[in-house]
Curated annotation (Swiss-Prot):
Keyword Iron-sulfur belongs to the record: no
Known EC number: 5.3.1.4
Family listed: Belongs to the arabinose isomerase family.
Species of the source: Levilactobacillus brevis (strain ATCC 367 / BCRC 12310 / CIP 105137 / JCM 1170 / LMG 11437 / NCIMB 947 / NCTC 947)
Designated name of the protein: L-arabinose isomerase
One GO MF term: manganese ion binding
Protein task: Catalyzes the conversion of L-arabinose to L-ribulose.
């Protein structure tokens, strides 16, 4: 389900006519070469298209207008090969409505001491041309990104690639539609928020639906469709009957698959890319969606439990940014406070994303007291090890805030035979005590998105693009 348009990024370089036509042709040739080699590097997830050498305010303004109305263009990359008077960039930059990357680089990565002359100096002026251009962006309070270094170096290309993913996620953020099945968990504070402001700032549309609307769609799913999904499930996961008799086990799994197909069809009909559930709102449903939710999250839908639409929308954005790679809905569940073992055990009742599994997930059926419904099927697995980030978004009186930190993710020290859920252990890199204290001081909630694929820098870049306050704990 996670499909993204074939976006591209338009690349322009700044100059001025006083250098002469031959020099401007040389500037264009160098810029085209950079674009070609960036594309050939295999590093960039989206194509860079060199458009032109920008020499006048009129050409820059017209270019930015063209960027805005081309839906296949996700953003702009600029470079000042020579000195480009920055007043020329004011109007166009103010009109730009898409992400902007200033690539502060130089065509050649060395100083040719034996051959350097004023012709070379006049043509290779990035050292001060990029400063002139950066000044006007700072003066205009543009939420742009600056990547500094030689364009041919892998670390610079990696930075551009990561920014491209953020820029695409920004564009796709304005297409995020969240279907709320039921309301938020009663009397919970942090899952609330200003939906109008969220649509203005991040583009997130949030709509409420009664459970009866969803149940009607679920009941339309045929046995034949469930049979097909059951066979697919058997091919991908380990089916564990456990203490259940065969008929009870199969029925429970089939109920979840019926929910999976019903929810998916409901979302597809409405163009929704994320959803929430709430164990307090289950009218007409045999089970709380567990396996159903996990399969939808696996497919790329954003998800939030207990009506948490902010985390659902954030999850969708992060899945786009990460190409749906090891990025999962999570909750801080319980703690290990022993000296030398400090850690958070993250989980949820049923809905943790199998993209972070380190082992082959098992389809199991167990009782769940919360919700008061029949025993739900769910995927049970252990999370992964490695560097990751944990991020949340909360709403305050003065706007939205993104809170996050880097973590060391690990597998639990032991088995949990009496806790048949998906689980992930982690410790904030700043330490559990510091991390937890600063998280709570910042007002971070208990629902988060954990990602092994994304970086703090990328999430900070996204927050900057949408004008969100940032509180990253370092």
């Amino acid at each position: 389900m996670l499909s993204v348009p074939d976006y591209e990024f338009w690349f322009v370089t700044g100059s001025q006519h006083l250098y002469g036509e031959e020099q401007l042709k040389s500037v264009a040739k160098d810029a085209q070469d950079i674009a070609d080699k960036l594309n050939a590097s295999g590093k960039l997830p989206y194509k860079v298209v060199f458009k032109d050498v920008m020499t006048t305010a009129e050409s820059i303004t017209n270019f930015m207008k063209e960027v805005n109305y081309n839906d296949n263009v996700a953003g702009v990359i600029t470079w000042m090969h020579t000195f480009s008077p920055a007043k020329n960039w004011i109007r166009g930059t103010e009109l730009l409505q898409k992400p902007l990357l200033h690539l502060a680089t130089q065509y050649l990565n060395n100083i040719p001491y034996a051959d350097i002359d004023f012709d070379y100096m006049n043509l290779n002026q990035s050292a001060h041309g990029d400063r002139e251009y950066a000044y006007i962006n700072a003066r205009l309070n543009v939420n742009n990104k600056i990547v500094y270094g030689y364009w041919g170096d892998e670390d610079v290309q990696d930075q551009i690639a990561r920014w491209e993913d953020v820029a695409v996620a920004y564009n796709e953020s304005f297409k995020v539609k969240v279907a709320r099945f039921g309301d938020t968990m009663r009397n919970v504070a942090v899952t609330e928020g200003d939906k109008v402001e969220a649509q203005i700032k991040m583009g997130w549309t949030v709509d409420y639906y009664g459970i009866g609307d969803l149940v009607e769609e679920i009941n339309k799913v045929s046995d034949a469709d469930v049979d097909k999904e059951y066979a697919d499930l058997e091919s991908k996961y380990t089916m564990v009957q456990g203490d259940n008799d065969a008929e009870t086990y199969k029925h429970s799994v089939r109920v979840q698959l019926q929910q999976y197909l019903g929810i998916k069809r409901f979302l597809e009909k409405g163009g929704y890319t994320a959803f929430t559930t709430n164990f307090e709102d289950l009218w007409g449903m045999e089970q709380l969606p567990g396996l159903a939710a996990q399969l939808l999250i696996r497919d790329g839908y954003g998800f939030g439990a207990e009506g948490d639409w902010k985390t659902a929308a954030l999850g969708r954005v992060m899945k786009i940014m990460s190409h749906n790679d090891r990025t999962a809905f999570m909750e801080d569940y319980t703690l290990d406070l022993r000296k030398g073992h400090e850690a958070i055990l993250g989980s949820h009742m049923l809905e943790v994303d199998p993209t972070i599994a380190s082992d082959k997930p098992r389809v199991e059926v167990h009782p769940l007291d919360i919700g008061g419904k029949a025993d739900p099927a769910r995927l049970v697995f252990t999370g992964s090890e490695g560097d990751a980030i944990d991020v949340t978004v909360a709403d305050f009186r003065d706007g939205f805030k993104m809170i996050g930190y880097a973590v060391d993710a690990n597998k639990p020290e032991g088995e949990t035979p009496n806790l048949p859920v998906a689980k992930q252990l982690w410790t904030p890199k700043v330490g559990l005590k510091t991390g937890a204290l600063e998280w709570m001081k910042a007002g971070g909630g208990h629902h988060t998105m954990l990602s092994f694929s994304l970086t703090e820098e990328q999430m900070e870049d996204f927050a900057t693009m949408v004008g969100m306050t940032k509180a990253f704990i370092k």
